[in-house]
Amino acid sequence: MNEQANTPALAVNDKVPQVVFKTRIRDESVGGDNPFVWKDVTTEEIFDGRRVAIFSLPGAFTPTCSSTHLPGFESKYDELRAKGVDEVYCISVNDAFSMFQWAKQLQVQKVQMLPDGNGGFSRKMGMLVKKENLGFGERSWRYSMLVDNGVITLLNAEAGKVDNCETDPFECSDVNTLLSQIDQLAASAA
């Protein structure tokens, strides 16, 4: 059992971990059928001076992630932007190729896909769990968060975080919960 069950290593008011994401970006100068190059993207580039919504999920092409979690954030992207969110990222412990093909299949146009291929970000967040019971290896626990200038402002980690969890909870990391919390933050600041 995961010793950090139900308690993420990082919490509201903590800084997000510093890692480098291995991404692929389109570069027309490459030419050919696959005009993409590797690009390292740091957490500083993603979070510094920006208000960012993040949601992390167990895996590309998996049922809840594909039917509800990612499509929910994609459909409410403009609402998040209207509430002062600069960008929305989907993180999964998958490689850049899988994340690209998954977004393409779901016709994701707005949410940015962020591959955490080696699980470094998820591990440092305290959200990496074993999913060996499903043949997945290590994956991210499902959560969402709002990050202001690198500091976690809101964090919604699903309950029951344990290695080899028999269920896939999806109760609080959805886009509607995050939107409601952003409204509450704005109301309390007024």
Enumerate the language-model features and the residues they cover.
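Chalcogenol-based redox active-site neighborhoods
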Residues: 1-190
